[in-house]
């Protein structure tokens, strides 16, 4: 399947790798199906690209690579919505807000993207924990190109 993207142009994706969101990402009601596109083999960043909207894409990263003590408990409701049965079938991403210079970019730790990897369901979860929506990326050496 081919999709048009603002960042990568027209690309081919494997439909089996798409992620269906069980609820909308706030502010993006028309985007329900996404795919993760790596920015490069050696970079810890992906584009969470909407299948429905070419211009809807988020730079995401694994928050545990940037804040090793990051931890939260998913509600039973979120687990049920996503069909989570085992922790090994869960991936977590944080949306990155890019700034110049790159070192001043931030991660949204308050609202992670949680993906159940077996059935490929996703949801942005708003945490009650005291995590910030703008956690400094700081010392990360990689750059998004």
UniProtKB/Swiss-Prot annotation:
Taxonomic superkingdom: Bacteria
Location (main, coarse): cytoplasm
Any one Gene Ontology cellular component term annotated for this protein: cytoplasm
Subcellular location: Cytoplasm
Phosphoprotein keyword on record: no
Gene Ontology terms describing biological process: bacterial-type flagellum assembly; regulation of translation
Keywords per UniProt: Bacterial flagellum biogenesis, Chaperone, Cytoplasm, Translation regulation
Task performed by this protein: Acts as an anti-CsrA protein, binds CsrA and prevents it from repressing translation of its target genes, one of which is flagellin. Binds to flagellin and participates in the assembly of the flagellum.
The protein's assembly and partners: Interacts with translational regulator CsrA and flagellin(s).
Recorded family membership: Belongs to the FliW family.
Protein known as: Flagellar assembly factor FliW
Originating species: Exiguobacterium sp. (strain ATCC BAA-1283 / AT1b)
Lineage: Bacteria, Bacillati, Bacillota, Bacilli, Bacillales
Gene name of the record: fliW
């Amino acid at each position: 399947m081919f999709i048009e993207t603002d960042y990568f142009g027209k690309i081919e994706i494997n439909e089996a790798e798409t992620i269906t969101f069980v609820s909308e990402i706030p502010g993006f009601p028309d985007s329900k199906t996404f795919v993760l596109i790596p920015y490069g083999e050696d970079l810890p960043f992906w584009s969470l690209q909407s299948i429905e909207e070419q211009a809807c894409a988020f730079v995401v990263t694994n928050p545990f690579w940037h804040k090793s003590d990051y931890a939260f408990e998913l509600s039973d409701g979120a687990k049920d919505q996503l069909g989570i049965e085992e922790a090994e079938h869960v991936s977590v991403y944080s949306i990155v807000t890019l700034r110049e210079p790159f070192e001043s970019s931030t991660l949204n730790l308050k609202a992670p993207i949680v993906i159940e990897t077996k059935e490929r369901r996703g949801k942005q979860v708003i945490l009650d924990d005291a995590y910030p929506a703008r956690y400094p990326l700081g010392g990360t050496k990689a750059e998004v190109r």
